[in-house]
Amino acid sequence: MTEHGLMSELDLLVSEGRNPRTMDIDLLPTIDVLRKINDEDRLVPVAVEKVLPEIAAAVDRIVLAFQKGARLIYVGAGTSGRLGVLDASECPPTFGVPEDMVIGLIAGGPDALVRSTEGAEDDPKMGAQALQEIGLTPDDVVMGIAVSGRTPYVIGGLNYAKQVGATTVALSCNPASTIAGIADIAISPVVGPEVLTGSTRLKSGTAQKLVLNMLTTASMIRIGKSFQNLMVDLNPSNKKLVARATRMVMQTTGCTAQQAKQALHQTSNDVKLAILVTITGLDVEAARAALGKAGGFLRKAISDPTA
């Protein structure tokens, strides 16, 4: 695309527009600059609320993929790609899932996480190649993340995913974007022009983070990774998380700290099993079997441990 063509295309994007409410921001004292930013940030959850039905549709497809042993794969560039990698990296410690269950792919590879590699996003073939290298299957879900909705790396990834037969989801902050037209499900929270024109790490990035939080959290809840509102499948890999695991056993069973620690020791720090053993009196192997029959849903295993 020529420079003139690119400029014309950017002129049409909401996310590249100039914000009339911040035209004088360079003249303001610090506290008023912050108020302007804060006022604009208030618009983000409102925009996300408007696309909850589309987010729910994506969650349902992700749950189906997880139930088949398949994956959720984020594809993005720049800030969008980093947010995908961040969300993916939080899933194993939070929900005790394998590292390859949720994957974040970013244009430019790992180096792009710590330094700008803006040119890496311009080749659609690289998006397709990244998915080829991880062995994309028809059972996987691929989410393309791009504020503009026109990033070539993301477009290439989504087009390849469509060829493979995987479910495709687009997350952009512009209505009727290119990637929205490609994907099976389009999530487009329109947050309006940024405080600083085109700085989409601001409101747009915040909107993306909120949506990604919802997608993985709701999907993990739907496959039994929580009990009540507790992260009972977390991996207690440091002192803080060990303390959190102990508290969860205490909170759900009413036992003492010593009893909770003993139950966690018996179950090799498996919070779900520790809770089930404490509540039902089952031995560890019987509790493990009951949890398996319940499909990993702790509430179901507690209500009928002999099912």
From Swiss-Prot:
UniProt pathway annotation: Amino-sugar metabolism; 1,6-anhydro-N-acetylmuramate degradation; Amino-sugar metabolism; N-acetylmuramate degradation; Cell wall biogenesis; peptidoglycan recycling
SUPFAM superfamilies, per database record: SIS domain
InterPro entries, sorted: Etherase_MurQ, Glucokinase_regulatory_CS, MURQ/GCKR, SIS_dom, SIS_dom_sf
Gene Ontology biological process terms from the UniProt entry: 1,6-anhydro-N-acetyl-beta-muramic acid catabolic process; amino sugar catabolic process; N-acetylmuramic acid catabolic process; peptidoglycan turnover
Active site: E90, E121
One function term, GO molecular function aspect: ether hydrolase activity
Enzyme Commission number, as recorded: 4.2.1.126
Stretches assigned to the SIS domain: 62-225
CDD domains cross-referenced by the UniProt entry: SIS_Etherase
Keywords tagged on the record: Carbohydrate metabolism, Lyase
Reaction catalysed by this enzyme: N-acetyl-D-muramate 6-phosphate + H2O = N-acetyl-D-glucosamine 6-phosphate + (R)-lactate
Subunit structure: Homodimer.
Family affiliation: Belongs to the GCKR-like family. MurNAc-6-P etherase subfamily.
Other information: A lyase-type mechanism (elimination/hydration) is suggested for the cleavage of the lactyl ether bond of MurNAc 6-phosphate, with the formation of an alpha,beta-unsaturated aldehyde intermediate with (E)-stereochemistry, followed by the syn addition of water to give product.
HAMAP family assigned: MurQ
Biological role stated in the UniProt entry: Specifically catalyzes the cleavage of the D-lactyl ether substituent of MurNAc 6-phosphate, producing GlcNAc 6-phosphate and D-lactate. Together with AnmK, is also required for the utilization of anhydro-N-acetylmuramic acid (anhMurNAc) either imported from the medium or derived from its own cell wall murein, and thus plays a role in cell wall recycling.
Protein's name in the database: N-acetylmuramic acid 6-phosphate etherase
Gene (name only): murQ
